[in-house]
Amino acid sequence: SDKQNSNFMYKDFEKTKSYHTSFINAQFTGTSLRAAHMKYCNFTNCVFTATEFIGTNLRGSKFISAKFVDCIFSGGVLDKANFKGATFSNCYIVGVSGRSAYNFPDDLSGNVVLPALPLQDTISKELSAVIEPLRENDYIRRSHTLHLKNGKINTLTIMILKEIYSNDQLVQLLPLLPKIVTTQFYTISHLKAFLKKAEKEAIL
């Protein structure tokens, strides 16, 4: 199918399946591709901003001259995907190997590359204590931004938020989220926007 020149803003494509779809020149902003299958698709010249590829299967897809800005790659399949001329800027690339892909850049300076998610014990007891009750909020829990299965916390999100906020600030701001989050959201970029609102509330 043909999705050329499309503009996807804050979309949720979790667990969707696309095969042999042309997304040439499309723009993806604040979009979640969590556990999606995007196999043998053509993403040539696409621009991905604050988009999350979590456990995404990208086998055989073309990302020729694509731009990735503020994106997250965690796990997933890049077999035979072609990244010729693609650029990555301020992205987090976690537990992803480009070895089975074609033309995946060797030099990823200006990005954060990690072999695995940060360990659970990198999160302070105080912070864990405010994150855990937020599971009761359906919007927050379903977003997967703070909580993972088996009672675990999304340590990557916390690491990213700590570039903006101190531990104490997060302990203060996170409990304000249930009042502010009134719609379903899917990405860390959206969570950051909610925290900005929480900051204003806290100042008031």
Role assignments for model-derived ranges:
Residues L134-L204:
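Charged, low-complexity intrinsically disordered regulatory/assembly segments
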